[in-house]
């Protein structure tokens, strides 16, 4: 009997003993940096001469790992391995596959601090965010294992005289997982192992910036006894193998989290039926957001300011759920803005090894992109605080608030994916909802209000997949807040939901006559 699902706890760093233990873990992980990571195909670890570097975004002189680059030939071998493994893996019972996932979760739990420390170095994650990422990975795995057990017997359908009918679920085949760098363990583990527990096999192409974090999962899968070939590990240059993975006649599904441009490209290419392809590919895509917090009149302005700042600047704003737009009633606009600026002044920015609130942004490309948007925002509105950027040692950008913006302004329309939030005002709640919906995205949103009528209006009209009342718009919790968005935010395949595994299953009906 499996115990009920329970979320994995974080670590309380207000306890000095926990701080000291994690500092030791950071030192241990630091001593292991700089190794060459292999590709892994059919259980074989293959080190390549052709590599790329994963570096510490907080200290760009520090090498995290050299990463072997998979070629198209390697991808072909990986598909061959996965197709072969699928024949046996799909025959495992739902219960046995779920129990293996629970074993994986138990090993991650034992190594949680190690995995968290890797993310501090490789992704520039603050301590709490890194531990939360590892814990969420455990949550996804535990949740999906139980979901598979619940689906094991299918769903009841009607019988009639002389006829017995069964409705049940079966696996699809081999697929491709392309996870992001911003939740390099949680999303990577969840989007890899959800299809696996459903009986499918996967080629995992990790994000180039966080390959070591993904490789830790490969180590754990091997320790847990996952049969070789069920997950093949193919890090590489997306320009060389990205389209090749998506286009393959062997790819039954693609699960992707990342940019809108890449997501829509995957969606388009997956719609093309290749020669020899006898099925339609499925795409499960999450592509970002332009998330807003709407602040009504007659509210707690401290709550409003704190909700905005926490949601905007946690992990340097590098969350698809991050607040990048504050839409504030004109009667409280000045007060909320003033308090938000005051809170921002208190934030610490620096190398997250030192447990700062904010660390770097992930790489030079993102650094330059965010700098450009700050320059644009300074022309469209007024920079109230922040705006400074320094890449002399790492990719650091100060938390930035831009006021006096219009909904049509570029920084209020386009996803920045950095520590930048724009403020605009409204005079009535209907106008607020119009502004909130005035983007191509629809992922998360929040409303700070004491007016029940306005809240109901937001529930019905604020066009986002995840909507929160009187709190920030980040920090969805597995089992509580299934996560996914509308419009150009993706396919709304809610991760951590009772329905998520259905993306990787086919429904079959068997009618037996007597």
Swiss-Prot record:
SUPFAM superfamilies annotated for this entry?
A: ALDH-like
Question: Which branch of life, at top level?
Answer: Bacteria
The reaction(s) catalysed by this protein are:
L-glutamate 5-semialdehyde + NAD(+) + H2O = L-glutamate + NADH + 2 H(+)
A GO cellular component entry from the record: cytoplasmic side of plasma membrane
Instruction: Enumerate the GO terms in the molecular function aspect.
Output: 1-pyrroline-5-carboxylate dehydrogenase activity
Annotated active site residues, numbered on this chain, are: 286, 320
Record-listed E.C. numbers: 1.2.1.88
Its BP terms in the Gene Ontology are:
glutamate biosynthetic process; proline catabolic process to glutamate
Which Pfam families does UniProt cross-reference here?
A: Aldedh
Query: Keywords on this record?
Result: NAD, Oxidoreductase
Q: Which residues form the signal peptide?
A: none
Q: In which pathway does it act?
A: Amino-acid degradation; L-proline degradation into L-glutamate; L-glutamate from L-proline: step 2/2
Q: Which family does it belong to?
A: Belongs to the aldehyde dehydrogenase family. RocA subfamily.
Q: Any idea what this protein is called?
A: 1-pyrroline-5-carboxylate dehydrogenase
State the encoding gene.
rocA
């Amino acid at each position: 009997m499996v115990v009920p699902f329970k979320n994995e706890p974080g670590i309380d760093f207000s306890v000095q003993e926990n701080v000291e233990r994690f500092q030791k873990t950071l030192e241990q992980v630091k001593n292991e940096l700089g190794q060459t990571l292999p590709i892994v195909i059919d259980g074989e670890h293959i080190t390549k001469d052709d590599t790329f570097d994963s570096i510490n975004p907080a200290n760009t002189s520090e090498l995290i790992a050299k990463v072997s680059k998979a070629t198209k030939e390697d991808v072909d071998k990986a598909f061959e391995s996965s197709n072969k493994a699928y024949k046996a893996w799909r025959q495992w019972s739902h219960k046995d596959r779920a129990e293996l996932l629970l074993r994986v979760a138990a090993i991650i739990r034992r190594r949680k601090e190690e995995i968290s420390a890797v993310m501090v170095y490789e992704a520039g994650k603050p301590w709490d965010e890194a531990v939360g990422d590892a814990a969420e990975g455990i949550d996804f795995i535990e949740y999906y294992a139980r979901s598979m057990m619940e689906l094991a017997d299918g769903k009841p359908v009607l019988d009639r005289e002389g006829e017995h009918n069964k409705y049940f679920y079966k696996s699809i085949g081999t697929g491709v997982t392309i996870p992001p760098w911003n939740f390099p363990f949680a999303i990577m583990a969840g989007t890899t192992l959800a299809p696996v527990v459903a009986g499918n096999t996967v080629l995992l192409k990790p994000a180039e910036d966080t390959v070591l974090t993904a490789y830790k999962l490969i180590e754990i899968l091997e320790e847990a006894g996952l049969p070789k070939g069920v997950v093949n590990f193919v890090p590489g240059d997306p320009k060389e193998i990205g389209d090749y993975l998506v286009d393959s006649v062997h790819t039954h599904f693609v699960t992707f989290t990342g940019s809108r441009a890449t997501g829509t490209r995957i969606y388009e290419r997956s719609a093309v039926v290749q020669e020899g392809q006898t099925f339609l590919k499925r795409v499960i895509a999450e592509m970002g957001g332009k998330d807003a917090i709407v602040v009504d009149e007659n509210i707690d302005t401290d709550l409003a300011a704190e909700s905005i700042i926490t949601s905007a600047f946690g992990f340097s704003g590098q969350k698809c759920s991050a607040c990048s737009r504050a839409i504030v009633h004109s009667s409280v606009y000045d007060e909320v803005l003033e308090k938000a600026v005051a809170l921002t002044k208190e934030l610490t920015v620096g190398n997250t090894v030192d447990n700062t609130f904010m660390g770097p942004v992930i790489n030079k490309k993102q650094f330059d992109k965010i700098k450009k948007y700050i320059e644009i925002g300074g022309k469209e509105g007024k920079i109230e605080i922040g705006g400074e950027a320094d890449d002399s040692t790492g990719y650091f950008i100060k938390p930035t608030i831009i006021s006096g913006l219009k909904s049509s302004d570029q920084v209020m329309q386009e996803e920045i994916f950095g520590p930048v939030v724009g403020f605009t005002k409204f005079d009535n709640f209907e106008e607020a909802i119009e502004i909130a919906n005035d983007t191509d995205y629809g992922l998360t949103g929040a409303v700070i209000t004491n007016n029940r009528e306005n809240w109901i209006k937001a529930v019905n009209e604020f066009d986002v997949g995840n909507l929160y009342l009187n709190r920030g718009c980040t920090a969805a919790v597995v089992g509580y807040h299934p996560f996914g968005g509308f419009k150009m935010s993706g396919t709304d395949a809610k991760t951590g939901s009772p329905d998520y595994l259905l993306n990787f299953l086919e429904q079959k009906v068997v009618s037996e006559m007597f």
